[in-house]
Amino acid sequence: DLHFAPTIRNRDNLLREGLPAERIFVTGNTVIDALLQVADKPYEFQDEVLSKIDFAAKRVITVTCHRRENLGEYMDNIFGAIGQIAREFPDVEVVYPVHLNPKVREAARRHLGKISNVHLIQPLTYQPFVRLMAGSYLVITDSGGMQEEAPALGKPVLVVRRETERPEAVEAGTVKLAGVERETIYEMARTLLTDPSAYQAMAKAVNPYGDGHACRRIIDVLKRGEFDAE
């Protein structure tokens, strides 16, 4: 077997499991290749709400929140912080493709449904969602994949969880753990909206999950045949 590890940490984990170093190659994650290919394609939003947002004039915050461990008090805190930010910054447009879980939808409507610059929309397919991320100023999420994808587009990510399975992102500075307390989430988002240096530090940090060339590196390894084929 060959092992194409997205990150150095992934490689080190494989080594600790006893896998031979000569069969492990750090390539980046192929999902970033796919993301950047989609992001480069021309696309016009079909969604009525998204088609009316002036992404050049507004600072768009993309939100996703769906994890079961956040249901209840934590989700109330998260949505409360997002609502507070939306009310304080009239140049911000919050876009939240709401998960289909009825409990998530109820909480979202209760906290955010009456705020004029918060848009609760239906879930998006991949291409429009990538375009939404690409046009965003900031991402607030409890999703795992977005912690890898949004930084590839130069977007800071606040993770509304107590922990993350993507520690490389935190170490690289592309992601910050905002936790699940309302005041902390609010303050961290506010900092990114008011402190250009803090924003740029995250936006320009190098994404540890790849640069869009993982597939090429994998192909190069296979072509070179620098491994035992048996």
Locations of regions flagged by a protein language model:
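Nucleotide-activated sugar donor-binding and catalytic core shared by glycosyltransferases
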Residues: 1-96, 101-230
